[in-house]
A protein has these predicted regions:
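C-terminal substrate-binding subdomain of Rossmann-fold SDR/epimerase-dehydratase oxidoreductases
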Residues: 16, 198-314
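N-terminal Rossmann-like NAD(P)+-binding domain of SDR-like oxidoreductases, especially those catalyzing
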Residues: 1-176, 220, 296
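Conserved hydrophobic/aromatic "anchor" residues
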Residues: 11, 123, 130, 178-181, ...
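Active-site loop immediately N-terminal to the catalytic Tyr-X3-Lys motif
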Residues: 93, 175, 187-188, 235
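Short-chain dehydrogenase/reductase
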Residues: 89, 178-179, 238-241
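Active-site proximal helix/loop that lines the substrate pocket
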Residues: 82-88, 126-129, 179-185, 211, ...
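Aromatic/hydrophobic pocket-lining residues that form π-stacking "cages" and hydrophobic walls in ligand
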Residues: 108, 157, 161, 194, ...
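A glycine/serine/threonine-rich, flexible loop-to-helix segment
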Residues: 136, 187-195
């Protein structure tokens, strides 16, 4: 396998690239260091990879890089580059989401139509493509009705992947990630904010009553799903990738208190536009096709993120 990983300096991209390199895969990584969160964090994510012989890094946007040269001998593409964040996707900033999530994906898909060596393109989609009225657990064939502009952009890119499969036989596989957490998690994400505030003794903002639930998925399980999809994923298909259980924010706060041995201080804020009330993945299709099953439970994974963040702060 010779892989291209887009968004390689990010939370999931860097973790995936490290696993691939450890498995002996030749990896080219591309990232543009968007300013959504501080560049030094992404540089730390890359530090270990840059010392590896099986890894080469290119700093560029997908729209600007010479894709023909970048893809020349690649057999697999993992497309994780995206503009993240539900709450920032409203208003004028939506142009950034269309540019980085939709336009960049279409440009990449167009480029790989000229790649006879391509075995799989694995696209990082999101549970945000579902809506609040979706029956739980969410199945891949449920109606998609995003409640945020971010979700709309991810669904549009997912649809582009299917169109390029249907019309050009590009072997795309899309993975709908459910709330990914673990070491290197972005600073705007819930667990990172909760853990950091608890470590520093600061209040945690909880939006609403805290009874909203999520299907939390550890980053190494997401990495395993990507690798399985690159080998066994059925081209044209979409798979849910979840952690296997619904947990409320209040339950998470209790667990953080036990892990940190310090009771979190909570400040209740109003519910934010675009936040889904509940998410829960039906992963039976991924289990059947990819042999996917989550291996890291919430307490184990949250402890790993706590230890990483505690070391980063100190």
């Amino acid at each position: 396998m010779k892989a291209l990983v887009t968004g390689v300096a990010g939370f999931i991209g860097s973790t995936l690239a490290e696993r691939l390199v450890a498995d002996g895969v030749d990896v080219v990584g591309v990232d543009s260091f968007t300013d959504y969160y501080p560049r030094p964090m992404k540089e730390r994510n890359l530090a270990g990879l840059l010392a590896c012989r099986g890894f080469r890094f290119v700093e560029s946007r997908i729209q600007d890089v010479d894709l023909a040269a970048l893809l020349a001998d690649r057999t697999h593409v993992f497309h994780l580059a995206a503009q993240a964040g539900v709450r920032k996707s409203w208003g004028r900033d939506f142009a950034i989401y269309t540019e980085n999530n939709i336009e960049a994906t279409q440009i990449l898909l167009e480029a790989v139509t000229k790649m006879p060596s391509l075995e799989r393109l694995v696209y990082a989609s999101s549970s945000s493509v579902y809506g609040d009225n979706t029956p739980m657990p969410f199945r891949e064939d449920a109606m998609t009705q995003p409640v945020s502009p971010y979700g709309v952009s991810k669904l549009a890119a997912e649809q582009l992947c299917f169109l390029y499969f249907a019309n050009f036989k590009v072997p795309t596989v899309s993975l709908r990630y459910f709330t990914v957490y673990g070491p290197r998690q972005r600073p705007d994400m819930g667990f990172h904010k909760f853990l950091r505030a608890t470590i520093l003794g600061e209040p945690i903002a909880v939006y609403g009553d805290g009874e909203q639930t999520r299907d939390f998925t550890f980053v190494q399980d997401i990495v395993s799903a990507n690798i399985a999809a690159s080998i066994r994923g059925v081209p044209g298909r979409v798979y849910n990738i979840g952690g296997g259980s619904r947990v409320s924010v209040n339950e998470v706060l209790d667990l953080i208190g036990r892990i940190a041995k310090r009771r979190p201080v909570v400040r209740v804020d109003s519910v934010q536009k675009g936040d889904m009330r509940h998410t829960y993945a039906d992963t039976s299709l991924a289990r059947a096709d990819l042999a996917f099953a989550p291996t890291v439970g919430l307490e184990e994974g949250l402890t790993a993120e706590y230890q990483w963040l505690n070391e980063s702060i100190s």
